[in-house]
Amino acid sequence: MNEKIDTVIIGAGHAGLTMSYFLSERGLEHVIVERGRVGERWISERWDSFHFQFPNWTIELPGYKYQTEDPDGFVPGGEIVRFIQEYADSIKAPVRSGVNVTALESSSNSTRYLVRTNVGAIEASDVVIATGQRERGIIPPFSCVV
């Protein structure tokens, strides 16, 4: 038997956590599946000396602003990771780390989707793909009828 939930968010970065925030505010059941850890791309795909490319005063997620004594400075990548992880904790985001999505299919009931993962399948009414701006998308064949 597949787990059933209203919404599955794929990816626990800025976009996925922001979606989680707004779904939670509306009392909508959801889960975030993340192949690595919260903010994984900031952890594993940036060089050690990387700094955020926008001034500190611009760093904000819904209901959560980056606190700094230098609003015009540029925060190091490690601080961004901490900020994202603290945000996930503060909004009590329902993140499942270490869950790799292997397929997304329309389920036998055409109004739902089946998210296949390395730890089982989740049936959902809605799926939000928040895997990052440089992710190579694979568009499922059924998407033309959605």
Question: How would you describe each model-predicted region?
Answer:
Residues 15, 37-38, 134:
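Conserved Rossmann-like nucleotide-cofactor binding loop
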Residues 3-32:
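N-terminal Rossmann-like FAD-binding beta1-loop-alpha1 element of flavoenzymes
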Residues 43-82:
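Glycine-rich active-site loop/strand segments that organize a redox cofactor
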Residues 26-27, 48-50, 144-146:
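Glycine-rich, phosphate-binding/catalytic loops in enzymes
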Residues 22, 86-87:
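Alpha-helical scaffold elements within enzyme catalytic domains, especially in hydrolases
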Residues 66-71, 78-80, 87-92, 96-102:
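Dinucleotide-binding Rossmann-like beta1-alpha1 core, especially the glycine-rich loop
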Residues 3-5, 90-146:
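FAD-binding core/adjacent interface of flavoenzyme oxidoreductases
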Residues 20-22, 43-44, 139-143:
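Short amphipathic alpha-helical segments
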